[in-house]
């Protein structure tokens, strides 16, 4: 993997760059649609590629390990072939899902014992076997196994957890060297900064991760319920320490406003279920604010979903029609809303990149944040 930093914004820490892997070029800042179980919910791969057009999508190690299971993925020749996707994929390590989905999880130094949310069976994740699982899945960018702490989190617990995440990182790195890639292309490995919302812990963790000297770095444990101001404060601290010549990935973030504010602080990569999940609940993101398409005010609004026309659904269907589909609980409504939201997120990061390259990101960002903060 290669990262080229092309331009720094003169009035902020925002950056524009490119990440190059064996599956192609990723233009940063980038948003990665979440394809949890080898699909971005409600979107065909052809629509995803031709219309939404992301350079990279995300898969979840925890979910793919449980179903379809790594044996099937290996027989298929890896996740790219299994899901017919020839662009980049990033997989998380499963640490967050173990934290968020598993009712009965037991964390110890060796690893995490957890109960499957599918059938109640017990499984054990260690830094070593998670590296092996990610080798078999075959994503272009793979993540270290970490513990994601909740918010709020006791200081002493956050410190112990962070130190264990660092020890797990060392085990990941040591084991990865012993497990060759399986499908003839390279995999980049990113470690993860933790430390909850404690400034000193975030500094310690960022220094440890920077010293690990990997090709890219991630920030985890944010967007777990903390106020946005705390998220931004932690991101700022960490970005001051992480090396400038490597991509920075803020995991699980966020709203369109969160994304712009964190680009301002020096983040290059984002993923979040928000555009897809909120779409299925009738929330549409636009450059002028959010729309709850279920509201009665749209019942006889025959204007296009979004006159900007970022994706084909925006001008082919009206707000009234989309509202009707939600009222009738038709699958098509959720699908249209999902394509719209993902298209908008991709437009947003591409516009951000355009304005960074033009040198006027800061005033554009401030205008966009003000506009997007409205409910329509």
Could you describe each region identified by the protein language model?
Residues 138, 169, 173-176, 180, ...:
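Structural signal for hydrophobic packing residues in well-ordered secondary-structure cores
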Residues 24, 57, 92, 134, ...:
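Conserved, mostly hydrophobic/aromatic
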Residues 33, 63-64, 96-97, 149-150, ...:
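Short, solvent-exposed loop/turn segments at secondary-structure junctions
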């Amino acid at each position: 993997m290669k990262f080229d930093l092309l331009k720094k914004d003169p009035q902020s820490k925002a950056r524009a760059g490119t990440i190059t892997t064996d599956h192609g070029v990723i233009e940063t800042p980038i948003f990665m649609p979440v394809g949890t179980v080898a699909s971005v919910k409600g979107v065909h791969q052809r629509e995803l590629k031709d219309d939404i057009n992301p350079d990279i999508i995300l898969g979840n190690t925890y979910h793919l390990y449980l179903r379809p299971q790594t044996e099937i993925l290996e027989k298929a020749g890896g996740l790219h072939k299994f899901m017919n996707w020839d662009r980049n994929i990033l997989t998380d390590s499963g640490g967050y899902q173990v934290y968020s989905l598993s009712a009965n999880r037991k964390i110890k130094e060796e690893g995490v014992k957890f109960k499957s949310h599918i059938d109640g069976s017990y499984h054990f994740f260690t830094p070593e076997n998670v590296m092996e699982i990610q080798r078999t899945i075959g994503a272009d960018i793979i993540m270290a196994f970490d513990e994601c702490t909740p918010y709020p989190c006791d200081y002493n617990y956050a410190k112990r957890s962070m130190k264990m995440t660092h020890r797990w990182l060392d085990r990941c790195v040591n084991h990865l060297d012993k497990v060759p890639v399986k499908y003839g292309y390279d995999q980049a490995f990113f470690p993860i900064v933790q430390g909850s919302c404690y400034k000193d812990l975030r500094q310690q963790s960022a220094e440890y991760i920077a010293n690990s000297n990997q090709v890219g770095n991630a920030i985890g444990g944010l967007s777990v319920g903390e106020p946005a101001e705390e998220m931004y404060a932690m991101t700022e601290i960490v970005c001051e320490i992480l090396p400038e010549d490597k991509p920075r990935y803020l995991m699980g973030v966020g709203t369109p406003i969160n994304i712009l504010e964190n680009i301002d602080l020096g983040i290059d990569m984002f993923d979040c279920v928000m555009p897809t999940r909120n779409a299925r609940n009738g929330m549409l993101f636009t450059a002028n604010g959010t729309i709850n398409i279920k509201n009665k005010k749209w019942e006889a609004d025959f204007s296009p979903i979004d006159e900007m026309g970022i994706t084909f659904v925006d001008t082919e269907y009206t707000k009234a029609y989309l509202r009707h589909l939600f009222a009738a609980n038709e699958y098509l409504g959720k699908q249209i809303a999902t394509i719209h939201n993902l298209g908008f997120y991709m437009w947003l990061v591409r516009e951000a990149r355009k304005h960074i390259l033009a040198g006027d990101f800061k005033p554009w960002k401030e205008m966009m944040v003000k506009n997007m903060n409205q409910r329509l």
